């Protein structure tokens, strides 16, 4: 962490002690009998962003859906703060690859959808929506519709909606893949501090990405998935100060390390 971030009152400390989300011996078998992955063991710690990388077809996106229980795993257990979960929970939010906004709703209503099922008043809901839009820098665009916003703005709406339900864990499935590189890079620069702001309830986050530069830029730890059926073949801790830049030789060292680790194991 950079000295500037360490002194930022809006940025949480990083003790990396308490386990937040954990899965044990997780496996998933598709209805056709194909095994997506097997015996997956991973965990996230307090205020930690964990990345999952691996070739296409190794079940990374499926794993995120299993962790959120949108699709139950076939075998294994998932724990949130030490308690086993067996159904979808508002404590775990998932951002999909596609930029999911409802075109007939303005920004406020798109975020408000994330509060469906919450036992709160209309006034409380409106305040949460306003707070989340402010957090992602879109407070002045509350009445705008998706067609009036850029791809980056729409993705911010998706992030605000995911955070509105006060989750403890945020799962991100290739969140920048459909953005142009300039927009994606700008959002990457902000996402780490955004999700771990003291203004959110998040304790940890998991990112699935094929972009290794993105992974080194954002992740505290990386799990590598390979094989068929896929398993976790490596775990890499990335110990770099923030904000991170590719101009840093240590950044490039981690990138080379990750590439060298992936090639013989995954042939990518």
List the model feature ranges, each with a label.
Residues 112, 123-141, 190-196:
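Conserved ABC ATPase "signature" region
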Residues 76-88:
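Conserved ABC transporter NBD signature motif
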Residues 145-149, 153:
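Conserved ABC ATPase signature
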Residues 68:
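Helix-to-loop junction immediately C-terminal to a conserved catalytic motif
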Residues 53-55:
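The feature captures the beta-strand-to-loop junction immediately N-terminal to the Walker
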Residues 105-112:
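Short coil-to-helix segment of the ABC ATPase nucleotide-binding domain corresponding to the Q-loop/switch region
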Residues 166:
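Conserved catalytic motifs of ABC-family nucleotide-binding domains
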């Amino acid at each position: 962490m950079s000295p500037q971030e360490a002194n930022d009152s809006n940025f949480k400390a990083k003790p990396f002690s308490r386990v937040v989300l954990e899965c044990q011996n997780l496996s998933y078998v598709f209805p056709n009998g194909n095994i997506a992955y097997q015996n997956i063991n991973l965990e996230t710690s307090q205020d930690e962003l964990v990345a999952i990388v691996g070739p296409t077809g190794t079940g990374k996106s499926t794993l995120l859906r299993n962790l959120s229980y949108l699709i139950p795993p076939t075998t294994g257990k998932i724990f949130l703060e030490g308690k086993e979960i067996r159904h979808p929970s508002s404590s775990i939010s998932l951002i999909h690859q596609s930029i999911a906004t409802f075109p007939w709703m303005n920004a406020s209503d798109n975020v408000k959808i994330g509060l469906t099922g919450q036992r709160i008043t209309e006034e409380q809901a409106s305040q949460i929506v306003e707070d989340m839009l402010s957090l992602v820098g879109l407070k002045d665009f509350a009445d705008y519709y998706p067609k009036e916003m850029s791809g980056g703005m729409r993705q911010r709406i998706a992030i605000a909606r995911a955070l509105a339900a006060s989750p403890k864990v945020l799962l991100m499935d290739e969140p920048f893949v459909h953005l142009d590189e300039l927009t994606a890079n700008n959002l990457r620069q902000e996402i780490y501090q955004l999700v771990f702001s003291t203004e959110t309830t998040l304790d940890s986050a998991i990112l699935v990405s094929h972009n290794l530069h993105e992974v080194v830029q954002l992740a505290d730890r990386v799990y590598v998935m390979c094989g068929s059926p896929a398993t976790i073949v490596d775990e890499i801790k990335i110990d770099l100060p923030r904000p991170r830049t590719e101009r840093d030789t240590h950044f490039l060292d981690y990138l080379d390390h990750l590439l060298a680790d992936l090639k013989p194991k995954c042939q990518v």
